[in-house]
Amino acid sequence: MNYERQNIQRMTGYSSGEQPSQPGIIKLNTNENPYPASAAVAAALQGMRIEDLRRYPQPLANDFRRVAAECHHLHIDNFIATNGGDELLRLVITTFVEPGDAIAIAEPSYSLYPVLAEIHGCHVARIDLEDDWRMGADFAKRLNASGARLAFVVNPHAPSGLLTPVAELRALAGSFKGVLVIDEAYVDFVDPDLRHDAVTLVREMDNVLILRTLSKGYSLAGLRFAYGIGDTTLIAPMLYKTRDSYNTDVISQVLATAALRDRACAALSWEKVRLERARVASALTALGFHCAPSQSNFLLARVPAGDARFVSTDIMARECYQRLKDNGILVRYFDQPRLRDKLRITIGTHDENSRLLQQLESCLQLN
């Protein structure tokens, strides 16, 4: 007997990146920060007592929300803490979209968006990005034409790393007749000289919700802690109505608060990633790859064409992925339109990146 709802029977679940258990693997496939979390986080963990686990955590994670409010110069009521960014995405759909409504996503993008939409019985409107991964002048028009009440835009974009300027996001939010979720999972790695600050949109508009996570920039992917920033009309119903009870635990609240307080330490790792990003992009270009301009902690690299044995760069990309894997290096290969001829490569440490480049050069020579 099958007890699943019909829409669950029809759907395909989210496919996570490989998480190897064997030692020695160079893991450049899931966009984790290659550097450890700050000493303040380690000290906070060591300072916890077993007694701290006996009672339930703060229901609203108020200590963390206060620190986040100070960091972003907003009020505590503009913040919600969640068990990873994925919980916030679920909350947004649960709170603001009726079953059967349309949810718009920029295509290609984070593959969990359509999965969550299907779980909630929503129609997915896929709005194609331009060839250069930009949204295009008519993006807002296409969003509204889809009838979507909710739209997801990841910025910097995944999987390309392209950064959409705040001015374009402001215009999009002003034209879109629904809730615009700006997923800023990778924003910590943006060049500070660009002075990018989409949080200003929260002060100006009531339909913008920004997702931030501690998984990437703060080296806490294993903690599962994120937060949303938005107008109180967006935050309040999630915070007081649709959020799970005690949705973030005692340990994660303490460590996340310590991490955000020690932002200066985390910023040192962001600069290291930016320097390595530039070095790896330059080296890949010299090898014949084409890298999309990235402001994230990864590069989307189109492989150069192989010799006559290979009918397409799609096959060449898959071959490079497999040979890297055979040599203990994991990158991400997406078997989907517009991405089959590319590899998404997380920026690792200097030594990890150097080994990656050596193996890619060997792979190209063999082909």
Where are these regions (language model features)?
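Conserved PLP-anchoring active-site segment centered on the Schiff-base-forming lysine
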Residues: 95-116, 130
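Active-site phosphate-binding strand-loop segment of PLP-dependent enzymes
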Residues: 125, 131-190
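Conserved PLP-binding active-site segment of the aspartate aminotransferase-like
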Residues: 29, 230, 300-308, 325-364
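Conserved PLP-binding catalytic core of the aspartate aminotransferase-like
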Residues: 273-274, 286-327, 343, 347
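N-terminal "arm"/small-domain region of PLP-dependent enzymes with the aminotransferase-like
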Residues: 1-55, 70, 147
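Phosphate-binding glycine-rich loop
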Residues: 62-102, 120
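PLP-dependent aminotransferase class I/II
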Residues: 60, 207-292
